[in-house]
Regions:
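Conserved phosphate/ATP/ADP-binding segment of small-molecule kinases
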Residues: 4-102
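Conserved post-catalytic alpha-helical subdomain immediately downstream of the catalytic base
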Residues: 78-83, 108-172
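Hydrophobic residues at beta-strand termini and immediately following loops
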Residues: 105
């Protein structure tokens, strides 16, 4: 679920998603239209939460908390979720799971031209890995690859496909 906070996803829809989803991945975004009113804590449970640092700060109510403390302690206390990813921009991402300690996965972007859609690409690429039981390192790695590809595209001029992700991963692993 990419929840942009424009009112499309009502509390009753969230309740239904939490009750009926086989796997629920959530990115509740803060933006200029909803800033402060579309927190991930609207979702009482999820299988994977993926949000950026400002969104996490709003959700835990702390302007200065360290990213690893947010992802490994404060967010798990605020939402019933076994896996949480906090995207850190140039810093990559911090991952946490009940079965794993907090880990950092580096960013892979070489050129940044536009940030629009990077979090959406991250979630779209990483959620399937989480759904089939991937490790947090694997989930964060694939998500960061997708995010790196997306920040190299202005707006929505083109999309990211499987071939681009596979090619990028192959290049990184050489």
């Amino acid at each position: 679920v990419n929840d942009f906070g424009h009112g499309l996803i009502a509390p009753s829809t969230i309740e239904l998603l939490c009750r009926r989803s086989k796997f629920l991945a959530v990115n509740a975004q803060s933006n200029s239209a909803n800033f402060g009113f579309n927190l991930v804590t609207r979702y009482p449970c999820a299988d994977l939460v993926c949000i950026d640092t400002p969104e996490a700060r709003l959700a835990v109510g702390s302007k200065f908390m360290d990213a690893s403390e947010m992802v490994g302690r404060a967010l798990p206390a605020a939402i019933n979720c076994d896996r949480i990813i906090l995207t850190l921009g140039r810093g990559g991402c911090s991952t946490w799971a009940k079965a794993e300690d907090v880990q950092t996965v580096p960013a892979f972007a070489k050129t940044v031209v536009d940030l629009v859609g990077a979090g959406d690409a991250f979630l779209a690429a990483s959620a399937p890995i989480a759904a089939v039981g991937g490790t947090m390192q694997q989930i964060g790695f694939v998500g960061n690859v997708a995010g790196a590809l997306k920040v190299g595209i202005v707006g929505h001029r083109s999309s990211i496909d499987r071939a681009a992700i596979v090619k990028s991963i192959s290049g990184l692993l050489k």
